[in-house]
Structures are given as C-alpha cells and as structure tokens.
Design a protein with these regions (language model features):
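Extended, non-catalytic structural segments that build the interaction scaffolds
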Residues: 10, 88-102, 149-168
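Basic, alpha-helical terminal appendages of large translation-related enzymes
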Residues: 156, 161, 171-297
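Catalytic adenosine-cofactor/nucleotide-binding cores of aminoacyl-tRNA synthetases and other
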Residues: 42-132, 235-270
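N-terminal alpha-helical segment
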Residues: 57, 87, 146-150, 209
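Short acidic/histidine-centered micro-motifs embedded in hydrophobic/aromatic stretches
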Residues: 41, 79-80, 169, 173, ...
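Conserved, charged catalytic cores of large soluble enzymes
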Residues: 110-154, 174-195, 199
Length: 297
C-alpha cells in the first residue's frame, strides 16, 4: 500500500513494451489499479560506451556510495542526465560536480552565511530592515522575488519530469545568493552601527534563501537538506516541504548552529582518479553472443 497504486511506474526503456502492454493486462486481470503513467528511462553509459559485463566496464555503485555518499551520487545523476535519455557516467565529472556545485556553491554559501550570523549577531537571526539603505533594500527585494520565481520553476521542472532543469534553477538561485553577499558586503555593514538593521536584513535574507534551497533540494539530496535545515536552527524538517513554501518562515530570535561542511571538497590526483575508475569496474568476462547492456536503475 505504501508503493502502489503508483502515480508513475518508472522502468528501463528496453522493457517498456512489456510494462506498458503485458503488465497492465496482468494488473487488470487481478483487479489491481493501474499506474497513472509509465515512464521509460535511458541507459547509463560509461565514457561513451554502454555498460556491459563482457566489456568489463560496469561501475560498481557500492564503492561509489561508500566514498561519496548517496546524496552526491543522486545529485550528479539527476543533474547531469536528462530523465528519458541515455546518460554518460564519468568519475571525473562526478568529482567536478561535487566540488563545483555541492562544495563550492551550496556548501560555501551555507558556511559563509552562518559564519557571519555567528560573528556579527551571536548566531541570532532577526528580520531587520533593508530599507534603511536604498541599495540594500533593492537587492534584498530581488532576492525575495528570485526565491519565489525559482520555486515556481522548480515545481514546473519536477511536475514535468525535467528534474535536471529543476535543479539548474535552484543552483542559479544559489549562485545569486553568493553574489548577494559580494554586493551587500556584510563585513562593511557590520562596522557601521547605523546600518545594523540593514545587516540584520542581509543575514536574514541569506538564511531564508537557504531555507528555500533546503526544501527544494530535499527530494534529491535529503541528507544534506536536513543538515542545512538543522544548521539554520529550524526544527520539524519531516513536516516541511516545498509545496507550501512561502517567504519569511524563519522567526525572529532563531539561533543558527553552524556545523561541519556538508560536502567537503574532494582532492584527487589524475593518476589516482584513473586507478579508481579501473578498480570500480567489474564483471570483466569474455564477450558472448548474449551480451546485454545494464540499464540505469
């Protein structure tokens, strides 16, 4: 009952015929409700070639999960591969994606934001008043508009199974928040007591923006999303979701709790990278006429 009836029945493209004709007939004969939609996904290929046991290029996911974690693997696959299309897996691209998107963009934004809240406001958030500085007020208003617009683009992408487009929209917003820090320069505002309310507003906008981000990325990187939520000083993560997300959810007086980096940067030498790729490929057996490609599951 937890998994069926299904809104979407996701299958590999090579078995779409069975699951769209034979499977529904079997369900109907048993009086079981049919899925609302059947979606055939593509294959996962490696360096331009289909994964196959005979070629010995099947990548074992277990070592990858142990090394990088499920969040990073899930993000890479869903961001870099359009659902429904064949997608290329590359360990080098995986590491680059972790370092650029997850560590630099997302992780660095969270760390910078919370560090400034702790340094300048003893870890306590208040709404503040961006209007005391016209420039701060203008860019802060843009952050709010961008948050709402990003949420709508994210919803559209998820509803239409364009998960990579949904994630790209979120990362555009994340990068805009990093730019917001550079434009508003909280370290300068902190030196002027007359700009205290503006500083409070900037720090609040950063953390509220991160609250939006945490709920939008939760379907893809749930472990990291919950860590972000907790570091923002928020509770009841399991009750929150992006469907009813509106700006201004962080209450005045919320105390942040900066923690360890959610995605530490990965440093790997090229030669080590090549060795790792080779060691993670298994099933290196002689090619046979019954060679079958391994679909992305």
């Amino acid at each position: 009952k937890r998994f069926w009836p299904a809104d979407v029945h996701l299958v590999g493209k090579e078995i779409v015929r069975f699951h769209s004709i034979i499977w529904p007939i079997m369900l109907m004969s048993l009086g079981i409700e049919l899925p609302k939609k059947i979606y055939g996904h593509g294959w996962l290929i490696v360096d331009g070639e289909k994964m196959s046991k005979s070629k010995g290029n099947v990548v074992d996911p277990i070592p990858l999960l142990q090394e990088f974690g499920s969040d990073a693997i899930r993000y890479y696959l869903l961001n870099d591969i359009q659902l429904g299309q064949d997608g290329n897996f590359s360990r080098e691209r995986l590491i680059n994606r972790i370092n650029s998107d997850l560590s630099n963009d997302l992780g660095n934004l969270l760390h910078r934001s919370l560090s400034m809240v702790e340094k300048y406001r003893n870890g306590v958030l208040v709404h503040g008043d961006a209007s005391v500085d016209p420039c701060i007020g203008e860019v802060s208003s843009e952050v709010e508009k961008n948050a709402e617009a990003t949420l709508q683009r994210f919803r559209n992408g998820m509803d239409n199974w364009k998960i990579n487009d949904a994630l790209k929209a979120v990362w555009i917003f994340i990068r805009s928040l990093n730019k917001y820090i550079d434009v508003t320069m909280p370290w300068v505002l902190a030196k002027d007591e007359a700009k205290r309310a503006a500083l409070d507003a900037v720090l609040y906008h950063l953390c509220e923006g991160m609250r939006f981000v945490s709920l939008m990325v939760e379907p893809v990187i749930p472990i990291a999303a919950e860590k972000i939520w907790a570091q923002l000083g928020l509770v009841d993560f399991e009750k929150a979701n992006y469907e009813n997300l509106v700006w201004g959810g962080i209450a005045d007086g919320t105390k942040v709790a900066k923690g360890m980096p959610i995605f530490p940067r990965i440093e790997v030498e090229k030669e080590d990278l090549k060795a790792k790729v080779k060691s993670e490929r298994k099933f290196n057996v002689k090619k046979t006429e019954n060679d079958t490609s391994v679909p992305l599951i």
